Amino acid sequence: MEKKNQNTNKKIIQTSNKQVHQMRDTRTKNASQKRSKKHRKKQVFGRQSIFAGGFCIVAALAIVIGIFVSNKTKTPYEKQVITLYEKENESLAEQQTNPEAGMDEGISSGLKQVRDYGVKLPESFQNPPIFESTFTSTGDTVLDTANRYAAMYDYDKAIETIQAVSGYESNAEYTKALEEYDLEKSRLFQWNDNYTITHIFFHTLIVDPEKTFDVSLSSKAQVIAYNEAMTTIDEFVKIIQKMYDDGYVLVGLHDVAEMVTQPDGTQIMQMKPIYLPAGKTPFVLSQDDVCYYEYMTGQGFADRFVLDENGKITNEYTLDDGTVIRGSFDVLTILEDFIEAHPDFSYRGARGTIVVTGYNGIFGYRTSDYWYNWNCEYFDQQNAEERQRMYYNNENIEADKAAAKEIAAAMKELGWTIASHSWGHIYIGSSSYGRVCWDSDMWEREVAPLVGGTDIIIFAFGEDLDGWQGYAADNEKFLYLKQKGFDYYCNVDASSEHWIQIGANNDYFRQARRNLDGTRMWEAVMSYTDSSYHNRLSDLFDARDIFDPARPTPVE
């Protein structure tokens, strides 16, 4: 059944991600045939496996995202059609047996549109191994909840969950579980050095590389920028799968270090113990610019976050014919699917950090009064020329704010943290003190009320406030940001696997982040055949296994 989007009046189809990814991969395969694939295979990568064919990549991407519709085994084709907006009083079981049974004209039309994009998967991929859940349900809600806590290494919470049940002592399954939790807890080790924890980050994921890398849809300069700074969904899925297979476990910034109140009332930053089984390695993850900027519209990226009918965060993506589909098309939603299947990838429920500016709104909603409200009471002449160029009145701005606020609350409920990226995506180091103050005030005014504030600032462009030695006591920008409540500061530096600093006065936490994007992966790929390139990712994965052949090369 079709729905109408109040703002866009476009058709919305609830679907699994396989549909849009299969569409994209089919188009990408056709586009890649136009390039000199044979030459790149021989001269650039030095190995055949990465180009084993778009076929495997098509299938892998199509089957790994959003497949958890129910516990019942379905064929790939059934999975594709089963999550279309349900029709009232329609039998789900009948749909699983016959995807077209009982569907009205609107649904049938929607299915035809989906089929027209070539979504049906090859028969050989009816039993996909990727994102196959490692968590086994017992059928007991309490026990399943406790087991999920235990899988995330939070044995105390698992024990509390069981012991909260009246009469648990007489339940053999519960008492056995408690014994197992105690045993597994005793086997944990404290991570030996929090200073060695790496921090990786991404920008908005590319859903459709053919569109993203099409100069006719943007510009040559923009395509180059996308190719350098962005990561495709194919690459992201392979990265997290590889890291999971190698024993990496996601921790939050607040798991690494925390502000501790002293007896005299002062607070100092201290490393926080992390307890994991032997063979596990903690890492931090963040994603920059989760705003779905207007300039990216129609260029192969998700449009925005929305909450589905169950209150779950999902993405919207617009097809070429204007049909809007929903699914997991970006870091947060894909990672949620992955953690649902692999709870042991998350340390005590930890998630990543979502990093937002404010000038263009957040999460795909145009929430900035400064840019989008004719009646903005605090507009001044600063940036007047740029404002005139971008400015239009968003008649739905209050509804957009409310929606963004709900999204932020849902993110935090899942365990995600939200960080400032500055309001205007400014160069924090080279900007004047006055500019930094004005920008910080704007983020506090326009974004903080929507996301609930934050103590994390992740600098735009990777630029920092000061040199590696530390923030000087008289650094007025740092003092102003500290006054605003920021305790965690992150830049970009991929020159080493990890870099962390706690201030000389124990008043801040500072960490370098590593960009896992086209630039870094291309450097890593080329390093195998050209010594002038440096491989900065070898501790995480072999970039030749990750690099998406849909990318234009060289990436530079």
Name each region found by the language model.
Residues 1-95, 100, 107, 111, ...:
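Gram-positive cell-envelope targeting signals
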Residues 15, 262, 308:
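Acidic surface patches and DE-rich sequence motifs
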Residues 95-102, 262-264, 393-398, 470-474, ...:
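Intrinsically disordered, low-complexity coil segments
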Residues 139, 150, 156-163, 167-171, ...:
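C-terminal active-site subregion of NodB/CE4 polysaccharide deacetylases
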Residues 195-212, 265, 269, 276-283, ...:
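Metal-dependent polysaccharide deacetylase catalytic core of the NodB/CE4 family, i.e.
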